[in-house]
Amino acid sequence: PCSGKSTIAEILSERYGLQYFKVDNHLEEYTIRGAADNLPICKKQIEWNAEQIWMRDPVLQCKDEIIFYEEIFDYIWEDLNKVNQKGAVVTEGAAYFPHIMKKLHVPEEQYAAITPTKDFQISHYKEREWVPYILEGCSDKEKAFQNWMGRDSLFADTVCKECMELNYLSIVNDGGNSINEMVQIVSAHFGWKV
């Protein structure tokens, strides 16, 4: 969900000379690969239209979104390891769920989750010029948007809860901190000179 992750990762990449791997740039490819590998949620995302995706209950959407990231994570990990061979990497994306990071034994000081409050997300998504294209084909675009934001709010809540349970840093962005302040928080957490 929209929380400033990409902007923060870009700044960290430039500031510390790290490669930047943005999962969102590869989601279409991973979805196609997953569908070809008969992964159920990936197949759904390829086959379903906007109405079928966005007019569903947000709870079901959130559940599917979590499963989707679990389905494609092997592809992400494979690509991330290729990039990592070329030097240190900063990476970001909603796919980096705390339970997946724990399973991979990612140390607490090498992971931070940044999620938005629902109000922050809605206010920023309403400014995104591509949102109408995502909802194109929905019979009730306002309801579809509400469902989407509901899904992402549940998703963010799940990430925060998992972070607490697994002792990972969770930063909730309500817009109260500037991007530079958030960059400093993340840098300090990673033990990087601020």
Regions found by a protein language model. Name each.
Residues S6:
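Walker A/P-loop
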Residues E14-K63:
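Conserved substrate/cofactor phosphate-moiety recognition/catalytic segment
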Residues I46-L60, R128-F145:
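A solvent-exposed, charged loop/short amphipathic helix patch at secondary-structure junctions
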Residues E65-K86:
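Phosphate-binding/switch loop-helix module in NTP-utilizing enzymes
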Residues L80-N84, T91-G137:
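ATP-dependent NMP and nucleoside kinases share a basic, alpha-helical "lid"
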Residues L154-V194:
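NTP-dependent small-molecule kinase module
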